Amino acid sequence: MVFSMWTRKRQILIFLNMLLVSRVFGFRWFPKTLPCEVKVNIPEAHVIVDCTDKHLTEIPEGIPTNTTNLTLTINHIPSISPDSFRRLNHLEEIDLRCNCVPVLLGSKANVCTKRLQIRPGSFSGLSDLKALYLDGNQLLEIPQDLPSSLHLLSLEANNIFSITKENLTELVNIETLYLGQNCYYRNPCNVSYSIEKDAFLVMRNLKVLSLKDNNVTAVPTTLPPNLLELYLYNNIIKKIQENDFNNLNELQVLDLSGNCPRCYNVPYPCTPCENNSPLQIHDNAFNSLTELKVLRLHSNSLQHVPPTWFKNMRNLQELDLSQNYLAREIEEAKFLHFLPNLVELDFSFNYELQVYHASITLPHSLSSLENLKILRVKGYVFKELKNSSLSVLHKLPRLEVLDLGTNFIKIADLNIFKHFENLKLIDLSVNKISPSEESREVGFCPNAQTSVDRHGPQVLEALHYFRYDEYARSCRFKNKEPPSFLPLNADCHIYGQTLDLSRNNIFFIKPSDFQHLSFLKCLNLSGNTIGQTLNGSELWPLRELRYLDFSNNRLDLLYSTAFEELQSLEVLDLSSNSHYFQAEGITHMLNFTKKLRLLDKLMMNDNDISTSASRTMESDSLRILEFRGNHLDVLWRAGDNRYLDFFKNLFNLEVLDISRNSLNSLPPEVFEGMPPNLKNLSLAKNGLKSFFWDRLQLLKHLEILDLSHNQLTKVPERLANCSKSLTTLILKHNQIRQLTKYFLEDALQLRYLDISSNKIQVIQKTSFPENVLNNLEMLVLHHNRFLCNCDAVWFVWWVNHTDVTIPYLATDVTCVGPGAHKGQSVISLDLYTCELDLTNLILFSVSISSVLFLMVVMTTSHLFFWDMWYIYYFWKAKIKGYQHLQSMESCYDAFIVYDTKNSAVTEWVLQELVAKLEDPREKHFNLCLEERDWLPGQPVLENLSQSIQLSKKTVFVMTQKYAKTESFKMAFYLSHQRLLDEKVDVIILIFLEKPLQKSKFLQLRKRLCRSSVLEWPANPQAHPYFWQCLKNALTTDNHVAYSQMFKETV
């Protein structure tokens, strides 16, 4: 434990150092050409590489070697081999889902016919691998040679039809195994799904096993005793035997749903058991499940629930009995007495066919469930909801959610909920509740009698219950087996106690309906037909209401006092109330917001508002206004100045969304009428063809401007001259062809720029100053029409070196031309294919001239060298006269020149070379050494010159490194000078390393005088021959050893 904690801390430090170094030195630790997103999760010490849906046909190069999580889902990778992850030794999770999805499950536009091939040992070298997802690849068998570190293996939606002991023997350390969806109607196997007896017994560490959607006919025998979760739903199991779960004492989750299903009205192929018989469960089948917490028996055609099933389930917390035939059983439910710790209970969609109950009868046994928090009874189908129906729930102090949706309730006295102030959600959605003036004492009641069969299909709206596999994992998300669903409008629910009356037949509301519901914080009335004229009195009992969803109704805003009774209201949704706004001659007062002192957010989307009796909206508190899908083009029509200040008196407004208002152009005067504190302005999807950029100066606090999905063709000359506060500019999906010369000059505050999906061909350097670009956090460029010519070289260079995040850089920022570069990624262009400026042209001309000059000189030298040489020296002698060169008498046989700083070379010279050549027992040579024979205090150059002059030969002991030093070059030049002055060749070269193959001098030297170029042999047996060659070279004049061809030429 201590070691693992230390390792984790060390990994975090490594990540921090890696990020710090990349920032300081300005380089990336993965290539820009990598077509994946790379993220670092420092607390978890994870490097996450996501290559989802990148059209890959192989695992890309450049994946960081320290990657821990690699996602390659939704691609077309045909095969995996041991080399696929060769350098990725730190991988902990690999997600290879959906690279060859089965035909009926996959896209019809790209049918995969060749299954993913996984070669043996492909994953065996990944010693840290913990999770492997291989779903949706048409695999025929479980991969072999998996690493022992693997804890999770997912093989869903493949073609694995047979489970045997043999193919599970390597999975002894697996804790989670998903084998579902390998044999069902959307992935048919056409054979019987077989599981060998006791096949899973070898997997002693197995905790989660899923065999869902497989046409399994019986519970597998002898499952591992440590199993915690078992999913067997949507199979064809007809019987649960007494001993099926005998040894599963630790099991916590059991799902047997969809075995012998109730098939009435389901939207998928469904085959019930014979005569609609239920799943037969032995009375003692669950006796061993003492630790069970979740039991799902959804859609098992159950008609009776014996109490004996639950006699040992004292810890059960969630029980799902939905979509069975338990309408009568629900009235008694004696089995609930055995479940004192139950937290969630679902009785939904147990209605009897052709039966419409007068009211609902809940069992008295419910009162024993003191810990119950969630009760769902959708689809019971009854007419009236009254106090006596719910009286049994008064004794449940912890009850938080009561779901009575989709019950065709016609009469509902909402005031019965005054006894349930602890409820957080009361769901009466998708019913037939409607008001009646004649029955005020009841509250809501019917306006017509309707048969239940006529509306039966409405049950399908509850998709949670009528999906074949509600827990199925998609290709994009690997999370599965989620907890129970949340309310549809989660935004409303978070404010507190919620009453959901959405999608009913309510067309009139009055205070008495909510008289005792003052505790409500959120009220959802969306999807009704409320068309009354609100005057500010209808909802006065709801003094604490903070969220009101009034969308999808027929709101008539005749009075400016509408909703004024809701003084605590913070969020108001009036979207999709276009009925009266589309009619002619109706008065609309949109200044009702003035009296809502705490209103923070107002949604008035998709109302087709084109007229208003009030010239302005007013509010001191409103911060967010959504006004999408209206007709500001009519209110701001040219020549009509009445509504130019329509939003001006929203003094606290920060976010204004006026997208989809058909604004082909925006009147310049509108900017003067904008709210003074506006920070976020959205004008998307308006069809704007022009925009008065200079008017942005009037919006002093504007930070975000969204002009996406319009028809703009131009950007401002200088964005900084238009706005000093703008940090985010979104211009995607327009018709912009070019950026102005100084577009971003001085726009240092900009952090996010999106110019994707335009028609930009060239980005000039002056348009994107580097100091501005380096301040950006996000630059979105994909789907433009870049011309990758010489004008783009600077941009390509910047893109390759910047740390700014550019989404889809490797895949979608591509060239449309010239032809050779069409479709090529911008970052992969060769920066050296273009001449940048006149300087390069001049340099090119000079270099060509130099080459031509050298060619002429060399040719002339080759043909007329000796003639020119003779003429030159003849006339030189004529003019200066002849002088005899004085030469000093030699004191040494050889001067040894070597790298005195290299200890290995020094050792070789002193112990090998000196020892051999100055050995008195053999022919004795007098050598001159720098460290031994030079005069102390005398200048180095003078010592060097004297040593060369006083020696018959100069021996250079060569290494690759020493050949590049200045001391070598100086000694060599002085030795070579003797050849020019005295016509004496004194140079001998000894190479201790492999000689420079490309050296022209060395090649020429070998041609002229091969005996003066020696190599120290690696074979010790060749050493005597080397010493003999060296002694011969020291005693022989180099001129004598010159090549015969050279002598004849001379």
From Swiss-Prot:
State the annotated membrane topology for this chain. Answer: Single-pass type I membrane protein
Molecular functions (GO terms) = double-stranded RNA binding; single-stranded RNA binding; siRNA binding
Q: Which residues lie on this side of the membrane: Extracellular?
A: 27-837
- GO CC annotation terms, alphabetical: early phagosome; endoplasmic reticulum; endoplasmic reticulum membrane; endosome; endosome membrane; lysosome; plasma membrane; receptor complex
Cellular compartments annotated: Endosome membrane; Endoplasmic reticulum membrane; Lysosome; Cytoplasmic vesicle, Phagosome
Is Ligase among this UniProt entry's keywords? no
Protein name from the UniProt record: Toll-like receptor 7
Recorded source organism is Mus musculus (Mouse)
